[in-house]
Amino acid sequence: MSNSYDSSSIKVLKGLDAVRKRPGMYIGDTDDGTGLHHMVFEVVDNAIDEALAGHCKEIIVTIHADNSVSVQDDGRGIPTGIHPEEGVSAAEVIMTVLHAGGKFDDNSYKVSGGLHGVGVSVVNALSQKLELVIQREGKIHRQIYEHGVPQAPLAVTGETEKTGTMVRFWPSLETFTNVTEFEYEILAKRLRELSFLNSGVSIRLRDKRDGKEDHFHYEGGIKAFVEYLNKNKTPIHPNIFYFSTEKDGIGVEVALQWNDGFQENIYCFTNNIPQRDGGTHLAGFRAAMTRTLNAYMDKEGYSKKAKVSATGDDAREGLIAVVSVKVPDPKFSSQTKDKLVSSEVKSAVEQQMNELLAEYLLENPTDAKIVVGKIIDAARAREAARRAREMTRRKGALDLAGLPGKLADCQERDPALSELYLVEGDSAGGSAKQGRNRKNQAILPLKGKILNVEKARFDKMLSSQEVATLITALGCGIGRDEYNPDKLRYHSIIIMTDADVDGSHIRTLLLTFFYRQMPEIVERGHVYIAQPPLYKVKKGKQEQYIKDDEAMDQYQISIALDGATLHTNASAPALAGEALEKLVSEYNATQKMINRMERRYPKAMLKELIYQPTLTEADLSDEQTVTRWVNALVSELNDKEQHGSQWKFDVHTNAEQNLFEPIVRVRTHGVDTDYPLDHEFITGGEYRRICTLGEKLRGLLEEDAFIERGERRQPVASFEQALDWLVKESRRGLSIQRYKGLGEMNPEQLWETTMDPESRRMLRVTVKDAIAADQLFTTLMGDAVEPRRAFIEENALKAANIDI
């Protein structure tokens, strides 16, 4: 047995070594975050396959504070018996052998979303640590892996009545570079899609870093998906067109509804995997739709009456659709599966769409009439826009080189090296024109607010002077017939507005324009937001620009520490220079972390934890130690309480892990709230940082401690007090000017702070979650008032430093 065990483990490592050498082949880019998030989806896909087979109801995905992710499901649990060929547990085979699992035995899973049949073993190979917990047949099994190597065989650690699998992994920082932190939005987008595509599965996403949580649970499948996508828009007909059929082994499911907007949004999926670039299913859908609608309009006499002929683009204006196909052996144009190329899918989708859409139009004449009316309006608007463009072109022939008069162009002709600044107002535009580098920086001042394109029809948009100027300057045209992102004249478009409410509004209007009319420009990373400094600080004759509030805090502390000494008692050597600076920066970093945690735990408790002895993981096994520790914490909190709250405690027995976990209970205005300081909290990175600071501060200051700066000294009882006094002292003789408008700076200052490539700061505009972005633009910029009011009520308290 031992011989075969050795040889099989060597074979396994060879397989996983290949993954470590070429991780991109298995999970995508390891540099830009796509591969990192793909790791989560590989594990989630296994749970979804359990759900599709009817064994799993709930999946919980948690981003932990130490940047690990766990995926827990209540399925059958991975088999734990010994595998006949490999001689180790089946779970270990699944975790360590490529192309192992139930996907290849056609009886286990019919259609599977598991992406490349490599799944969880790849996640294991690319994780510095992975924890596997299986609940199955009344027992809890646990195993730990490091870089894909099991540290011990699968072991039974307890008993349970539940079933399911939990995989928690810490991504290897040797593999993943640049982007190493999980982004909530990217995970939320995919999990939301999965919950729609797998009707009835409940998926929870929790972020332990800031307490954010979402529950995705939709019964109506893709019909509910279309409802969700149309949530803040105004659908023009009540009945969603929906069908789900299967023919020759290909399942086709389509849901669609028109709204009163002008954007077309079609989302395509194959076996639950999204195709960003569409493919044969999208081609079949579009062809059938145009043909069926045109045939209906001809037959019912609409086209003749309206004297227009509609195109496919007119038919898809304001359309929201989801096309989901289930194909046993799909073919894609590349490993990333962004485009489906299986030719048999086109005819399958086209055939079903032709038949069933024609049926729907005949059975719902009211809906059909409304939809046809919208299509005719779109065709007329297209004609009007074409005429408007021709007018513009004729005028343009008289204009020099066809560029707007306000544009101060640059000498550079290579778009990759050219920058266009969109500047708010003529006064700032004047300063920017004087301060710029003429070689590669062009300036276009925009007067007033540009049109809100979310609410405007295409022909109205073209007649807006500011929008027309902007389109001409960019040079890539607009509208379906003319728009060509490759003709963009500047590869850096920099939005430069004031730091007040009007500036924010203009920036939002411009972003709406780019996102709705020229999405590729945003996707290719050509749009930036300039970050002019917020403050100018003057001390004596020295002047300094400061970018934001965080930098301002740092600046004040660096001045405060200049010449400061902290005496921990009357006779001890003073703490000064680098040692004091290190302690202050660690204290500030921990305070910032505590402020972020405040939404999940009471701030008073977190601050008190700094001064309490450290509770270790080993301590959690001893009930007496835990009780003593939490009792001391609660006593201190009650002694220092100033707002009338009452603090109590409890100890929770965690039978599954044989642990005792403290619970802090606070009663405010007669209402009790529990804050469990469980195993995860005690072993997490946040508590570790609190304890590290605590070890340095506990007992640091004695009764006669004082802080000294220059000639002045102050007795202090706590480190916090000492820091507050220092910052107040540092403000003497300091004049702080807060900039609101770009016009407040002269051309030299504007160049130095905002336009000089050596010293400026810019934010690149990216879109992580297209559906969430679409909803946000609709909520904030659309016609409906209610969703906007709800958004403001929900987020008002999170806004800080609003300049009105």
Swiss-Prot record:
Residues binding Mg(2+) 1, per UniProt: 424, 498
Annotated region described as Transducer domain, given as residue ranges: 221-392
One Pfam family recorded for the sequence: Toprim
Active-site positions, per UniProt? Answer: 42
Q: Where does Na(+) bind?
A: 103, 105
Q: Where is the Toprim domain?
A: 418-533
Residues covered by region (ATPase domain): 2-220
Entry binding sites for Mg(2+) 2: 498, 500
Instruction: Tell me the outcome of changing residue 42 to D.
Output: 7% supercoiling activity, 16% DNA-dependent ATPase activity, fluoroquinolone-induced DNA cleavage normal, 40% ATP-independent DNA relaxation, binds ATP normally, complements the N4177 ts mutant
- List positions binding K(+): 94, 97, 100, 117, 121
User: According to the UniProt record, what class of enzyme is this?
Assistant: isomerase
EC no.?
Answer: 5.6.2.2
**Catalyzed reactions:** ATP-dependent breakage, passage and rejoining of double-stranded DNA
- In this chain, ATP is annotated as bound at 5, 73, 102-103, 109, 115-120, 335-337
Matching Gene3D superfamilies: 3.10.20.690, 3.30.230.10, 3.40.50.670, Histidine kinase-like ATPase, C-terminal domain
Required cofactor names: Mg(2+); Mn(2+); Ca(2+); K(+)
User: Where ADP is bound, by residue?
Assistant: 46
* Listed result of changing residue 426 to N: In nal-24, nal-102, nal-103, nal-107, nal-108, nal-111, nal-114, en-2 and en-5 mutants; resistant to nalidixic acid and to enoxacin
Miscellaneous note of the record: When the enzyme transiently cleaves DNA a phosphotyrosine bond is formed between GyrA and DNA in an ATP-independent manner. In the presence of quinolones this intermediate can be trapped and is used as an indicator of drug toxicity.
Print the domain comment field.
Consists of 3 domains; the ATPase domain (residues 1-220), the transducer domain (221-392) and the toprim domain (393-804). ATP-binding is cooperative, and both subunits must be wild-type at residue 103 for supercoiling to occur. Non-hydrolyzable ATP analogs (and ATP-binding) induce dimerization and enhance ATPase activity. ATP hydrolysis induces domain shifts that are probably part of the mechanism of DNA cleavage and rejoining.
What family does the entry list? Belongs to the type II topoisomerase family.
In terms of NCBIfam families, this protein maps to: gyrB (TIGR01059), PRK05644.1 (NF004189), PRK14939.1 (NF011501)
Query: Any idea what this protein is called?
Result: DNA gyrase subunit B
Give the organism the record lists: Escherichia coli (strain K12)
User: What gene makes this protein?
Assistant: gyrB
